[in-house]
Each structure stands twice: as C-alpha cells, then as structure tokens.
Amino acid sequence: MTPPTTYTAMEPCQVWSWDITWLPSTVRGRWFYLYMIIDLYSRKITGYEVHETESGEEAAALMQRSVLHEGCWRQPLVLHADNGAAMKSQTLQMKLYELNITASHSRPRVSNDNAYAGSLFRTLKYVPQWPSSGFRTLEDARHWVDKFTRWYNEEHRHSGIRYVTPGERHRGEDSVLLKQRDTLYRQAQKAHPERWSGQTRNWQPQGSVTLNPEREKQAA
C-alpha cells in the first residue's frame, strides 16, 4: 500500500517539519549546523540544537528530547523533512519507529516541499539581530539561537496564524485573543464607520493546516 503523501494537523503535535541549516562562523570555511523543528499547526519551534556536525545521531537525540519536552511521547506524530543524509539516516529512522513517529519526505525534484521549515529559516536569517559576520564560537551560536527561539515563540506575531504568537496558538490561547481583537475592531467600526470601507479584518482562528495540499490535487 502506498503511504499517504499529505497530512493535516488539527491541533498541535500532530505534524512537525524539520530541517538543518548552516550558520556561518567568523572563520572562513567553518560552519555550525542548526537543527530545528516547527509544529505545522501552531508554528511553534518545538525543538532545536546547534552542533559542529550534521548527523543522524544528533537528529535522533533531538527528536527524543523534543517529544519528551512537548509531552507527545509515543503519540501519533508525523515528521516531515527533505531527503538529506541526516534526515534519511538509519539511526534516525530507527528512533522515529521507536517513538511512533511517521516519517514523511519531500518529493524528488520539488524544491518547496518543506516550505514551513524553509520559511522559518528565512525569518531567522533576516531578523535585524542576525550576525552577518558570523558566530565566533559554538556557544555564541547556541546563545543566539536560544534568544531567537524565545522571541519567535513568544513575541513574534505570525501572519500565518492571524498575528498571534506561535506559543499562544500552541497553548490554545488564540481563540480568546482573536475574539477580543474581533470585538475591538467591530466596536471601532461602529464608533467611526466613515473610517471603514468594508468589513473588518477576519479574526477567526486559523483552522487546520495541511502539509503540501497540492498533492491531493495530483492524486485526484
């Protein structure tokens, strides 16, 4: 039986996506490797580490720590990644089996099949605090990523989830926050209708999130 090629997240910790990106050092030709996991439903960073090497062993250890931290140990979870060596390593695949995680991989020759992780890395590398000259040490890189992750999860108002933070959506706080925001906008429109040319912004909570939904069209 052919395994499914698209998955839908109705709540947090159902579908994760992950990738590895290079972080430059101040030494020419030397890089650090950022492993990072994002929850598709909430956009929360659910796991991350920075290492000096790229390996399936480091990835497997990160996955175990992440599911323990998020409290989804042995619960059904899909983990999407591209087709890199670390992502398809036997060590990682064995760990995913142990953790009851279903592996999903990008289609060959499709560049945007891991779009959520790619978008996260673009945000990371274009924030004003990004050290364009590189990181001096591994500890410097880890410290910077720690600060970025706290900002991204708890302060960054994400356009893809109605401008709440990933942490708020992950904890289920977005419904109340968006209802309050909708009420505020409607009151403002009622008080000054001349300032509004149409309906207020849609503040309904973002619904389910589907991984690569265009695949469904191809299968139809």
Predicted regions and their residues:
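Charged DNA-binding/catalytic regions of mobile-element recombinases
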Residues: 1-220
